[in-house]
A protein has these predicted regions:
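Active-site clefts of carbohydrate-active enzymes
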Residues: 427-450
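Hydrophobic faces of well-ordered beta-strands that scaffold small-molecule active sites
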Residues: 125-127, 183-185, 233-235, 329, ...
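Bacterial N-terminal signal peptides
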Residues: 7-16
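Beta-strand/beta-sandwich contexts
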Residues: 20-51, 103, 107-111, 117
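Immunoglobulin-like IPT/TIG beta-sandwich domains and homologous Ig-like subdomains
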Residues: 36-98
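Active-site-proximal helices and loops of the catalytic beta/alpha 8
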Residues: 223, 241, 246, 318, ...
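Substrate-binding/active-site clefts of carbohydrate-active enzymes
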Residues: 134-323, 342-352, 368-369, 382, ...
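Carbohydrate-interacting/catalytic domains
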Residues: 5, 19, 99-101, 108-125, ...
Length: 606
């Protein structure tokens, strides 16, 4: 009997000795030489890898440390890269007892120096689109085997519709003709979520484009072709949360990888109220709930206070800049992530890419609060977000309220716009604030209507004021919709983006008369705006509303653009003496678009 136990014990020891040790994934999949930060974090994932020792033998690369996490299927490997390390491939050797596993890793040369990456600014006009809803250029990737259950159904506004990167690439000439200079896509990374997650805001792989949109190489190719047309690409990223189907939830690296990790038994949702950031009397309870609560059950809240989570996210953003040559970042749900971590990320990014730009989604409608988030704001001192561009939800709120009012009294109609810009004294850099009249999370500016004069007036203001303007796909053809039914009704398919569509608004012949009028208006204004230093760099002078008219001027190096907006339903007369300091002795100006009716705008070059 003793012999049986001895044999059994020996067998168990043998099985333990040769238990599996696998590496399924290493993030990032490769890295670049010449980065300012010499530290490189590798997140190694595979069965039983957590107990392994690691060695590396490559000139200029040394092992700094390894970090074992609570799950035995993760191992964090920290390498130090010398300043003069050469591009090349080398082996990472993992050993545990008699077990040995070798994985090849590569360091690549950077395509250009960090200072050569130029971001977007006030000279640009951004065009926001949802890849799933713009155009389907490759129907073969609509259904991908092995992904979480989903359907492609264009009759369901909340399902996937099949749009992809190929569809965007095939219509780059459309954007060139329209005159936009930058495209911002909603997130394109893998969202392997039940139902399809067409919007892209529930990431399940930070290093992989969703195969229903295309591949990493196709994304890179699209950007190269956009650059050939002088069109920039802004990448939508999310540091605040990931998707619940991410491997980090299925096999949690550690309990502190997420905030409130016991979501199945004790779900904590964010309050969605961002006031604790600025409230001098806020309670810790309110601050924690806002910052650490989950958006929804399908979007786990990442803990950026964990230094390993932080480093993973920072490296990921740098990797996409280097790999795909993206021209800017739009950071989703910016204030919901840890403030100090985001500030440090921005500091690192600005040091590595000094001419780059990132816009943070700061959804607050008070100018003081929006300004609090901008880099070098005195309002947040001694803190500093280091975030160069914030989103002007105050402008969005005011223009969408003003459109339903007559400009007859103070604080009504266009007087709201005048007062909104009064608060520009709060911003360290008003010209680096991103303005918009609608986006993928709001009602369309037209609602369910088709008031073209109102749209023209708002768009004239958007494209000529002291801001970085952002348009939303389809506005140029008067796409409308409201969110009351669901988000899908403000994210409709672009007509003509699918083979067999009844209409094709991508061509003049496929648009109605009023759609062509709207498109031509945008085309004229956007192309006039390109390379216009008065718009990109000019100062601004605004006038109090007179007789329902709001007027302002942009000035730069002796050139002036003068804009007058009539905020009433009737023709109105305003004595030019009000604007004498701008008009001076000018006998005439050049009106690039002549529009003389109620609720319109006149632009004059002096």
């Amino acid at each position: 009997m003793k012999k049986v136990f001895l044999i059994l014990g020996t067998l168990l020891l043998s099985l333990s000795t040769y238990a599996a040790m696998n590496v399924n994934k290493i993030d990032p999949p490769f890295w670049y030489t010449g980065m300012q930060n010499p530290e490189l974090q590798l997140m190694v994932y595979g069965e039983g890898i957590g107990n392994a020792a690691v060695s590396v033998n490559y000139p200029g690369v040394s092992l700094s440390s390894t970090v074992k996490l609570e799950s035995n299927n993760y191992l964090l490997v920290y390498l130090k890269l010398d300043k003069d390390v050469k591009p090349g491939k080398f082996n990472l050797t993992f050993t545990e007892g008699k077990k040995k596993l070798v994985k090849e890793y590569e360091l690549k040369a950077r395509n250009k120096k960090g200072c050569e990456h130029k971001g977007f600014d006030a000279s640009d006009a951004l065009y926001l689109l949802m890849p799933d809803r713009f155009a389907n250029g490759n129907p073969d990737n609509d259904q991908i085997a092995g992904m979480a259950e989903y359907k492609v159904d264009r009759n369901d506004p909340n399902a996937r519709h099949g749009g992809d990167l190929a569809g965007i690439e095939q219509h780059l000439d459309y954007f060139s003709d329209l005159g936009v200079t930058a495209l911002w896509f909603t997130p394109v990374l893998e969202n392997n979520m039940t139902g399809g997650s067409y919007h892209g805001y529930a990431t399940t792989d930070y290093y992989k484009v969703d195969p229903r949109f295309g591949t990493n190489e196709e994304y890179k190719q699209l950007i190269e072709k956009a650059h050939a047309r002088d069109i920039k690409i802004v990448m939508d990223m999310i540091f605040n949360h990931c998707g619940v189907e991410h491997v980090w939830i299925k096999d949690m690296p550690s309990k502190d990888w997420f905030n409130n990790p016991d979501h199945e038994n004790n779900f904590v949702q964010t309050s969605f109220k961002l006031t604790p950031h600025v409230d001098p009397y806020t309670s810790q309870y309110d601050a924690d709930q806002m910052n650490d609560g989950w958006f929804v059950p399908s979007m786990p809240d990442l803990n950026q206070k964990n230094p390993h989570v932080y480093r993973y996210l920072v490296q990921n953003s740098f990797w996409w800049i280097e790999f795909a040559n993206i021209d800017g970042i739009r950071m989703d749900t910016y204030p919901y992530a840890d403030y100090d971590a985001m500030s440090n990320w921005m500091k690192e990014l600005n040091e590595e890419y000094p001419n780059y730009n990132t816009v943070g989604e700061t959804w607050v409608t008070e100018p003081a609060y929006t300004a609090w988030w901008q880099k070098d704001s005195k309002l947040s001192a001694p803190k500093n977000s280091n975030l160069k561009t914030v989103m002007d939800f105050s402008f969005f709120d005011k223009i969408n309220t003003a459109k339903n009012e007559q400009t007859e009294t103070w604080f009504k109609g266009l007087d709201r716009i005048y007062n909104n810009f009064v608060y520009d004294f709060l911003y360290p850099n008003p010209a680096s604030v991103l303005a918009f009249i609608e986006n993928h999370d709001t009602d369309r500016f037209l609602g369910e209507g088709n008031n073209l004069p109102m749209l023209k007036q708002a768009s004239t203001l958007l494209l000529t004021t002291r801001r970085i303007p952002q348009l939303y796909y389809g506005t140029e053809i008067m796409m409308n919709g409201v969110k009351s039914k669901s988000d899908g009704y403000v994210r409709k398919d672009f007509p003509g983006g699918w083979t067999g569509d009844a209409t094709n608004a991508l061509t003049p012949a496929g648009r109605t008369k009023i759609q062509n009028e709207c498109y031509d208006f945008y085309k004229t204004l956007l192309n006039w705006r390109k390379g216009n230093d008065v718009i990109a760099k000019g100062s601004m002078v605004q006038f109090m509303v007179q007789n329902g008219v709001y007027a302002y001027a942009r000035q730069y190096e002796g050139k002036t653009i003068f804009v007058m907006l009539n905020g009433t339903d009737a023709e109105t007369t305003v004595p030019l003496k009000f604007y004498k300091e701008i008009l001076k002795n000018s006998k005439q100006g050049k009106d690039i678009i002549i529009v003389i009716t109620a609720i319109t705008a006149i632009r004059i070059l002096l």
